[in-house]
Amino acid sequence: MKKYNKDNIPNELLEAAKFISEDKLKKAEPILRDYLKSDPLDVNAMKLLADIGIKFRAYKDAGYLLIRALDLSPDYDPARLSYANLLYKRQLPFEALEQISILLEKDPTNIQYLTLKAVNLALANQHDNALEIFEIIIKEKNVVNNQLHLSYGHTLRAVGRLDEAIESYKNAISTKVGYGEAYWSLANLKTFDFTNEDINEIKSLLSNKDCKIDDYYHLLFALGKAEEDSNNFESSMAAYVKGNSIRSKQVPWDSREFSLECDEIIDFFDEDLIKKFKDVGDKNTDPIFVVGLPRSGSTLIEQILSSHSLIEGTTELQNIIALSRKIANKKNSSSKSEYPSALIAMDKSQFKEMGAAYIKNTLDQRVTDKPYF
């Protein structure tokens, strides 16, 4: 691994780092790509480019870069930390925990490593272990950080300690003025009531021209809930509409394109296709899962089914989504998806491999008191 000091850092890396610090990622990306063409073994450049990829949700490319960097330089801890963060964002907590364990062996009291371990334990439904770490960081090490208090609040909420969750969200707000996500987390508890003073405070924060966009739309959603609870329905709807309008500019969404994709999937998976693929795939009968759409009632169905003594409920899993993305084989956001058409060209062995991989990758989620699988 190349070691740089202030006198020998390549100009390209300095320029890219400057753009990254200014959040001008689209300017930094081509600089790093061009630099890596001339020096393909520079793990520092790989890590910087991977971090940009993570922010753009180009997880496949970012993962390749970080794995390559760690192959070349296993002791490059910043790259390993980025890789652990990537795995967390991909909702692969057990894989992330493996990377974090390597980091903690070297630096067992590192707050950043411990925090990342805690949030991954929470993601893996190991809430008690996560809370233990959060409480060491917050109560024993006296670390003050808005994101830390927010994550701690989420974990407290998951185990039903709602009063403590509220306190933690309020601590997050006191740590960072105008922290929109914490206000929205309070609103999303459904049991928390904003006071008139709270509502006026949110309105004041929204009028601040320095309010960042992420805070802004979260504050609008919180205001919408607060006004709704106060029966000010017109003001509530106005806040929700404005918040969603702002949020929609950050999330790539084309309703017409989505409708066409749904129509294509419905037409593709017809009776003839199902008959053709009847005997392919992994023969294991382990998983019981409900496939549905957000806001369609599938969560309620899952809750009803999982109350049965022989059915095991997990959490919302990303494995099917990840599998469909793998089949889609999109190189970037503008390239055409190969899903579902690519299924036609697959042979029986590929279906069996995908089924077996699904079983394997969901085993870690089976941590309830009904281990029938």
Predicted regions and their residues:
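Conserved two-lobed SF2 helicase motor
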Residues: P371-F373
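Alpha-helical solenoid repeat scaffolds of the TPR/TPR-like class and their adjacent stem/linker regions
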Residues: M1-Q365
